[in-house]
Each structure stands twice: as structure tokens, then as C-alpha cells.
Amino acid sequence: MMKQLIEDIVKALVDQPDEVQIKEMIGEHAHVLELTVSKADLGKVIGKGGAHASAIRTLMAAASGKEKKRYILEIIEY
């Protein structure tokens, strides 16, 4: 559920949605989502002063409350 939510949000922000990849790693205490986007779209995902990245993380925190799981978003340049 969380992976799909983040993928939908990010694909709406970028110019190259086909380049968006999300890898989920499940740990003992948290789930890590590694978001990979093209270099050209990295700024759009992070936003000015990290505003977009912060907003995405806030949505993740709100959505994860129902699942009782902790999610961490890592943004990686392609």
C-alpha cells in the first residue's frame, strides 16, 4: 500500500515517470523505501528547501499510522 502511494505521488511530480523505481526493504523496526528517480527529476522530488520530500514523508507518517509500521524514505539519484 505505502509503496504504491509514494509511487503515484512521485510519478505525478516528475517529467520521466517511467524512470521512477521504488525498492522496499523490510527491517526489524522499520520499512525502508528507496526511491530512485532520474537526475533531471531529482530537484522536483526534493523541492525547494526539501519541501516536497518533507511533504511526502509527512504523508507516509500519516498513512503508516493505520498499519502500525514505521517507514523511512530514502531518495536516490539515478
What are these regions (language model features)?
Residues M1-K44, A53-Y78:
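RNA-contacting regions in translation and RNA-metabolism proteins
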